[in-house]
Amino acid sequence: MTNFPKTVMLLGSGELGKEVAIAAQRLGCHVIACDRYADAPAMQVADQAEVLTMTDPNALKTVVNKHQPDVLIPEIEALAVDALQALEDTGICVIPTARATAVTMNRDRIRNLAAGELGLRTARFAYASDAQELQRAAAPLGWPVVVKPVMSSSGKGQSVVHSAAELDKAWEIAMAGARGSSAQVIVEEFLDFDLEITLLTIRQHDGTTLFCPPIGHQQANGDYQCSWQPASISPSQLQQAQTMARTVTDNLGGAGLFGVEFFLCGDEVVFSELSPRPHDTGLVTLISQNLSEFDLHLRAVLGLPIPSITAADAAASRVILAESQGHHVQFSGVEQALTEPDTNLLLFGKREARPGRRMGVALARGTQINEALAKADRCAAAVKVQVMD
């Protein structure tokens, strides 16, 4: 991809897509942002926007044929993956590949690949297609267990279950949070882990693999709350994580940045999940690295050099959540939030708030992780999300 500008089409236009769009435009690309609703965050900065049902194969093919993009960059899971494969077969470049998008959109396919085909260490797991089957599948794993829809995003539909009496409720939660048409869950043993990390893994067109320093993160109900970089892990743990990340991304192929999640349990590293795109926990790289995860994604996608990846001594992020439902979103406390040095805010531009919805993120650097986390916490706490109706 030596000639510029390029036309980039984003399939999904949330806050991560918005940063991808900005990174693409800095490289002179023409960006078309697509989503199922108008005025999504990435649409606010894109050159053009399209509203469509992206699980509709005909609608997806129509919009791609209309714009003839050089690259298609999926930013969400809920896509017509058969249409993506058909488009790739005609010569359209799907990032990282149509197969990678299909495999990672459902937890069962990526888990079967990782644990079954590739032999990566994972939590023990089983699948269930109804509440009765869930009862049978959960008991052999021991209590507690974690129940998740095979297809969801941002932790939706997840719950930790401590006894058989709670499984029917867990099934209801999973079905309410599921995306797509699949009525299936994955049930996993609950790991008594020390830390969750994301290893941002960059795969270039020639097969070269690069890694960012590991990112530690904390979640609530499966949804990211804060992250920090670098995570303190041993050389052995880092080697295990890098080996597993390289193994699975080489199998998926293509070029781009992958967010590979692991649990650290004592000296062991356990594969958790993988996203073939920038990761929400990686928002910290907007303040921590010389090239953010979004810059790295675009460089890999477009075949551009990545001479080095350097990171600050310590950096952290903390999400800013809405507490109420409504439109006409406004923010107060921004001035107070930005009084400390080496801090920044991203306010995503979402037009609708609802309790627990991620509306922004606070970023901070420090000399140590605890200092950076405390600064990010103060920055985020100062910002209040208000709705006018």
UniProtKB/Swiss-Prot annotation:
Catalytic activity: N(1)-(5-phospho-beta-D-ribosyl)glycinamide + formate + ATP = N(2)-formyl-N(1)-(5-phospho-beta-D-ribosyl)glycinamide + ADP + phosphate + H(+)
Residues that coordinate or bind Mg(2+): 261, 273
The entry's keywords: ATP-binding, Ligase, Magnesium, Metal-binding, Nucleotide-binding, Purine biosynthesis
Superkingdom of origin: Bacteria
Enzyme class label: ligase
Pathway of action: Purine metabolism; IMP biosynthesis via de novo pathway; N(2)-formyl-N(1)-(5-phospho-D-ribosyl)glycinamide from N(1)-(5-phospho-D-ribosyl)glycinamide (formate route): step 1/1
Transmembrane found in the keyword field: no
Residue numbers binding N(1)-(5-phospho-beta-D-ribosyl)glycinamide: 15-16, 75, 280, 350, 357-358
Subunit structure: Homodimer.
Similarity comment: Belongs to the PurK/PurT family.
Function: Involved in the de novo purine biosynthesis. Catalyzes the transfer of formate to 5-phospho-ribosyl-glycinamide (GAR), producing 5-phospho-ribosyl-N-formylglycinamide (FGAR). Formate is provided by PurU via hydrolysis of 10-formyl-tetrahydrofolate.
The name this protein goes by in its record: Formate-dependent phosphoribosylglycinamide formyltransferase
Species assigned in the record: Synechococcus sp. (strain CC9311)
Source taxonomy: Bacteria, Bacillati, Cyanobacteriota, Cyanophyceae, Synechococcales
